[in-house]
Amino acid sequence: SDVYKRQDIGFVDFAGSTIVHSVGGWIALSAVLILGPRIGKYSDANKGKFTGSSFPLAVLGTLILWFGWFGFNGGSNGAMDEAVPLILINTFLAASFGLLTGLGISFALFKKPDPYYVILGPLAGLVAITAGCNSMTSVTSIFVGIIGAVVAIFVNEFLNKFEIDDVVGAVPVHLAAGVWGTIAVGLFSDLEILGTGLTRLEQIKAQFIGIVSILSLIHICRCRRSYACRS
């Protein structure tokens, strides 16, 4: 459906920042915490050796995902009407400014473009805007994409600092950016477009309730299976 809306609380997630992305991110987080890092990943002897096998292919994959996201978000509208152009423009802007944010942070930290940040930025922007791409202004979408990239990069560095081995960046991109995007619906979306009948504060509360509900359900269902994988 175009909008996931719990009628009792008014939770809204247009194209799945939570229902699609955060679900995968919560599952990934529980798995990496239970399974632990790859052998030798954080040892001094192997420092810098655990890198991607082909960054050009990873960038190509990112561009393919970016292109496919127009169908993902636009198709979630369920009809080819006047809402679709705004959805596509917001999707593009969030991803573009996520890319620029990742590039800017990599230059600030490393004095050169870091391929991983260049990949992380647009993907985080795409995930973040997915929940509210139909109900935000273009300027707001830019802000959501920028913050999504910043949040994802921060979470990625946080995981590395505490030696939590997320091989493909599922937690920073899908979980962190997805949670941010879901909260952003309550903060910035046009309440008339959402159609929940809630005030701004009530909508923010509904978004938090939805996030926590998904978190609870996922960890109850998933943790037992992750422990089985470890054994």
What do these predicted ranges mean?
Residues S1, K5-G75:
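Glycine-rich, mobile lid/loop segments that gate access to catalytic sites or pores
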Residues D2-Y4, H219, C223-R225, R230:
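Short, small-residue-biased leader/transition segments that mark boundaries at the very start
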Residues K5-I9, G74-E82, I193-Q203:
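Membrane-interface helix termini and inter-helical loops of multi-pass transporters
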Residues A15-I27, F92-L93, I119, T140-F143:
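Membrane-interface loop-to-helix entry segments
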Residues G25-L33, P37, T62, W66-F70, ...:
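Transmembrane alpha-helical segments of multi-pass membrane transport proteins and ion-pumping complexes
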Residues G52-P56, P113-P122, G169-V171:
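Cytoplasmic-side transmembrane-helix entry/capping segments in multi-pass membrane proteins
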Residues A83, I87, L198-S216:
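Structural signal for the N-terminal portions of transmembrane helices
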Residues P85-S96, T137-I147:
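Structural signature of hydrophobic alpha-helical transmembrane segments
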